[in-house]
Amino acid sequence: MRVTIFLWWLAATMSTAQTMELRRVHDSLYYLNDWRLPYPVYQFQTGDVDGDGREDAMVGVVKSTRYDPVKGRRLFIFKASGQGKARPLWLGTRLGGRLHDFRYRNGRIRSLETTDDGRWVVADYRWAGFGMAFERFVVKGTDRKTAKEYFNQ
């Protein structure tokens, strides 16, 4: 009986494997599975951000927020929730500095940012239950060219 239940559960789990797909309608309207993103998208990555063994979607959007009225690059993270649906895991206003780009790398988000004084940094962030937590600077207080070299490693 236990083997039968396990095999049924395993088959059900495998048949409902979720993938995240970004579809562009035009420059400022995208859909992540069923989730409407009425903003320009500058980056799309997938990977297991929260460590639960399932693929998450990281979408870079350009928009203002309630807490930061200046249009800027933001990071949104989504989880597949069944039947092809996407649900937001984190809709970030800001990481550390002004976000220019990000990459998913070894279970972490690597960011390319500028500070308030115009210097460039590359930083790693990890999932912290709700949102991203700073882990370390890869390089900080540098110029754009050097930061991009570190970011692209």
List each language-model region with its residue ranges.
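Beta-propeller-forming repeat regions
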Residues: 15-153
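Short, low-complexity, intrinsically disordered N-terminal peptides in bacterial proteins
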Residues: 1-3, 153
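Sec-dependent N-terminal signal peptides
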Residues: 3-14
